C-alpha cells in the first residue's frame, strides 16, 4: 500500500467510512434502516407461514430477524417513513442517514464520535436538533 491509503497498481482509493469514501459498488446501493430490514424479514416470514408448502427458514434468516427485532428503533411504517423523510431533508450522506436512524445517539457529541464524517459538516446545535426530532418521533410511535 502506498502512503495516503491508495494502491497505485489498481487506481483504487482505500475505503474510509469516516471520510465517506466507499467502494464503487456502494455508489448505487441504497441503505436500509434496521427497522426497515425487520419489517421486510417479518413480511417474508409471514408469507412463508401462510404458504401451503411452508419452508423451514434458514438459521441466518432467523438470526438476522432476531437481530433486527432487537435493534429496531422504530415500530411501524409511518414512523420509519417520517424519520427517513426528516433525515432526507438534511444534507446527510445515505450512510450517515442510516447510522443516525439505526443508532439514535442522544447528543451531537455522541453522534460525531460514532459517525466521524459528521464532524465539521454540522454545527452541534443543528445536529442536536436533528437528534431531538428523531427522539420525538420515537416517543410518539405506537
Curated annotation (Swiss-Prot):
GO aspect biological process, one term: transcription initiation at RNA polymerase II promoter
Chief site of localization: nucleus
GO terms assigned for molecular function: nucleotide binding; translation initiation factor binding
Location(s), subcellular: Nucleus
GO cellular component: RNA polymerase II, core complex
Cited Pfam families: RNA_pol_Rpb4
Keywords recorded for this protein, A-Z: DNA-directed RNA polymerase, Nucleus, Transcription
Cross-referenced InterPro entries: HRDC-like_sf, RNA_pol_Rpb4/RPC9_core, Rpb4-like, Rpb4/RPC9, Rpb4/RPC9_sf
Similarity annotation: Belongs to the eukaryotic RPB4 RNA polymerase subunit family.
Subunit annotation: Component of the RNA polymerase II (Pol II) core complex consisting of 12 subunits: a ten-subunit catalytic core composed of POLR2A/RPB1, POLR2B/RPB2, POLR2C/RPB3, POLR2I/RPB9, POLR2J/RPB11, POLR2E/RPABC1, POLR2F/RPABC2, POLR2H/RPABC3, POLR2K/RPABC4 and POLR2L/RPABC5 and a mobile stalk composed of two subunits POLR2D/RPB4 and POLR2G/RPB7, protruding from the core and functioning primarily in transcription initiation. Part of Pol II(G) complex, in which Pol II core associates with an additional subunit POLR2M; unlike conventional Pol II, Pol II(G) functions as a transcriptional repressor.
Reported function: Core component of RNA polymerase II (Pol II), a DNA-dependent RNA polymerase which synthesizes mRNA precursors and many functional non-coding RNAs using the four ribonucleoside triphosphates as substrates. Pol II is the central component of the basal RNA polymerase II transcription machinery. It is composed of mobile elements that move relative to each other. POLR2D/RPB4 is part of a subcomplex with POLR2G/RPB7 that binds to a pocket formed by POLR2A/RPB1, POLR2B/RPB2 and POLR2F/RPABC2 at the base of the clamp element.
The protein's name in its UniProt record: DNA-directed RNA polymerase II subunit RPB4
Species: Bos taurus (Bovine)
Source organism phylogeny: Eukaryota, Metazoa, Chordata, Craniata, Vertebrata
Gene that produces this protein: POLR2D
Amino acid at each position: 500500500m502506498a502512503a495516503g491509503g491508495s494502491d497505485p497498481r489498481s487506481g483504487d482509493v482505500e475505503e474510509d467510512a469516516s471520510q465517506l469514501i466507499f467502494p464503487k459498488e456502494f455508489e448505487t446501493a441504497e441503505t436500509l434502516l434496521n427497522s426497515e430490514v425487520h419489517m421486510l424479514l417479518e413480511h417474508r416470514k409471514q408469507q412463508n407461514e401462510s404458504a401451503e408448502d411452508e419452508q423451514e427458514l434458514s438459521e441466518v434468516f432467523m438470526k438476522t430477524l432476531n437481530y433486527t427485532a432487537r435493534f429496531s428503533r422504530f415500530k411501524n411504517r409511518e414512523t420509519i417513513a417520517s424519520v427517513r423523510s426528516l433525515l432526507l431533508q438534511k444534507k446527510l450522506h445515505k450512510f450517515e442517514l442510516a447510522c443516525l436512524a439505526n443508532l439514535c445517539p442522544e447528543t451531537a457529541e455522541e453522534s460525531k464520535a460514532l459517525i466521524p464524517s459528521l464532524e465539521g459538516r454540522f454545527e452541534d446545535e443543528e445536529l442536536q436538533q436533528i437528534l431531538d426530532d428523531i427522539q420525538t418521533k420515537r416517543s410518539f410511535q405506537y
